[in-house]
């Protein structure tokens, strides 16, 4: 079986799903103490890189997703599916898992 090469630009979320590049975890505390990998909090903020067409309504039309590519979003801690591509961390979320858009 041939290996599949996946690029971020080829990921097309379905329905009301949103593909988010996770912001890096904090490397040290406010006091300057370096954190080991096992003590770092899982980030809950990231940048939207791909958006699905939206939730399908009963009449066949779509309700578009409220966020757009480039938006920074805050999402639930244990939400979505974690994906690693090209050394970067991503998460595939449903729109309901997004808590807020961050300016």
UniProtKB/Swiss-Prot annotation:
Cellular location(s): Cytoplasm
UniProt KW Transmembrane helix keyword: no
Sample GO molecular function, one term: protein-folding chaperone binding
Induction comment from the UniProt entry of this chain: By heat shock.
Keywords: Chaperone, Cytoplasm, Stress response
Residue stretches in coiled coil: none
Gene Ontology annotations for the cellular component aspect, listed alphabetically: cytoplasm
Gene Ontology biological-process annotations: chaperone cofactor-dependent protein refolding
Predominant location category: cytoplasm
PROSITE patterns reported in the protein's UniProt record: CHAPERONINS_CPN10 (PS00681)
UniProt KW Lipid metabolism keyword: no
PANTHER family from the UniProt entry: 10 KDA HEAT SHOCK PROTEIN, CO-CHAPERONIN GROES
Family: Belongs to the GroES chaperonin family.
Subunit structure: Heptamer of 7 subunits arranged in a ring. Interacts with the chaperonin GroEL.
Function: Together with the chaperonin GroEL, plays an essential role in assisting protein folding. The GroEL-GroES system forms a nano-cage that allows encapsulation of the non-native substrate proteins and provides a physical environment optimized to promote and accelerate protein folding. GroES binds to the apical surface of the GroEL ring, thereby capping the opening of the GroEL channel.
Protein's recorded name: Co-chaperonin GroES
Protein's organism: Synechocystis sp. (strain ATCC 27184 / PCC 6803 / Kazusa)
